[in-house]
Amino acid sequence: MKIRPFGVEQWMNEYETRCTYNLAETCVESLTVRQLLDLTGHTDLLQDLLPMKLTYGEIEGSDRLRSAVAALYAEQSPQNVLITHGAIGANHLIYLSLVEPGDRVVAIVPSYQQHYSIPESIGAEVRLVHLREENNWQPDLDELADAIGGRAKVVSLTNPNNPTGSLVDASTLAQISQLCDAAGAYLLCDEVYRGIDQQGPGTTASVA
């Protein structure tokens, strides 16, 4: 297995902590733990953690955490939640679990590099569907259907998109889901930036 160098991470590792002005940053300024607790109103959280034993823990993640994650979605239960080491770990696990050499993986790009480099390293046939400025960075569903071709194993997208920030609405997500269902393909929707476009209560519609 050989994975292409992760260009953006290598660049960020070399330069992001050494510059005066970082115009490429996608994250907000970091908070201290105290600021975060004050912001959420859970100032007694530390006292809740101190009696906790540092055991091996549940393989799938604690019931409390899985229930909290499930509550972020309209129709999900803790049984459908698996705790991983971030979205990177979750994506990696999905590709290693589902993709075999020769399988077709369709990646909507630009996107996080692992969504095409990992399947490529496994030996998958990777098809890229490009978002275009003239289409407001929205996926062309006809082009997507052609790439799926009735035989894709996995279709991946990031929503909100990384790096353009474009957002696929609930109606288009439903159409993409239908294309995947028709082909018997898994839809991997990386929603790590879900909520950054939030206005008012609630968060961005999820494909889940």
Language model regions located:
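Short acidic capping loops at alpha-helix termini that bridge into adjacent secondary structure
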Residues: S77-V81, P101-R104, R151
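N-terminal small-domain helix-loop-helix segment of the aminotransferase-like
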Residues: K2-G86, L93
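Active-site phosphate-binding strand-loop segment of PLP-dependent enzymes
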Residues: E133-T203
